[in-house]
Swiss-Prot record:
The keyword ATP-binding applies. Its cofactor is Zn(2+). The keyword Phosphoprotein does not apply. This is 7-cyano-7-deazaguanine synthase. Zn(2+) binds at C189, C199, C202, C205. Keywords: ATP-binding, Ligase, Metal-binding, Nucleotide-binding, Queuosine biosynthesis, Zinc. It catalyses: 7-carboxy-7-deazaguanine + NH4(+) + ATP = 7-cyano-7-deazaguanine + ADP + phosphate + H2O + H(+).
């Protein structure tokens, strides 16, 4: 039987950890990729490594990028404050072209591994309104992937899988718990401290806390 491989974007947060567990449950050999891109919340990289070990991935790769050299986001530019109150429109925590860049590098690794599936934990229900989390973006990237690669042109094809796309945060938490995810290992906060403790005020913290509450599951998040 041919090994079924998948490359999975793993930030170290709740959503991406759930996606790794889902892919593993579907029988994939999981190869996870994280990015050190100059983000404010670098504690998520330690969380990603913990999750990768705990879920038994085949290989965990960390790619260095200099997105802070571009700036334009509260997550990569320390002069822009992370908002602690809900706002309207696309928030300043949006990182320009981030998921496009991340998926492109995951696509390259997938082609080398001869993996046909790339998983990403984007969500368009309980989310911050980022344009690169929408179903239209995922579908467009998949079309591009199959036009721009040797494997795609030769008919092997890639699938961009976003299994959380239409799930609420509560449903995501429940799905992860059912598959053995230890959420105490994860970090979601946009301004977590070096120990991975959360602020409890940013949009990501609010979405996470609301998800656990709605799911009726104790939230293991540590706060500073």
């Amino acid at each position: 039987m041919t090994e079924k491989r998948a490359v999975i974007l793993l930030s170290g947060g709740l959503d991406s950890a759930t996606v790794v567990a889902m892919a593993k449950a579907e029988g994939y050999s999981c190869y996870t990729m994280s990015f050190d891109y100059g983000q404010r919340h670098r504690a998520e990289l330690n969380a990603a490594a913990r999750v990768a070990r705990d879920l038994g991935v085949v290989e965990h790769k960390v790619i260095g990028l200099n997105l802070d050299g571009i700036g334009g986001s509260a997550l990569t530019d320390s002069s822009i404050d992370v908002p602690e109150a809900p706002g309207e429109g696309i928030p300043v925590t949006y990182v320009p072209a981030r998921n496009t860049v991340f998926l492109s590098l995951a696509l390259g690794w997938a082609e080398v591994l001869e993996a046909r599936d790339i998983f990403i934990g984007v969500n368009a229900v309980d989310y911050s309104g980022y344009p690169d989390c929408r179903p239209e973006f995922v579908e467009a990237f998949e079309r591009m992937a199959n036009l721009a690669t040797k494997a795609g042109v030769e008919g092997q094809g890639f699938r961009i899988q976003a299994p959380l796309q239409n799930m609420s945060k509560a449903q995501i938490v429940q799905a992860g718990m059912a598959r053995g995810v230890d959420y105490s290992l994860t970090v979601s906060c946009y301004q977590a401290d070096d120990d991975g403790r959360a602020c409890g005020k940013c949009d990501s913290c609010r979405l996470r806390a609301d998800g656990f509450k709605a799911a009726g599951i104790e939230d293991p998040t540590r706060y500073f």
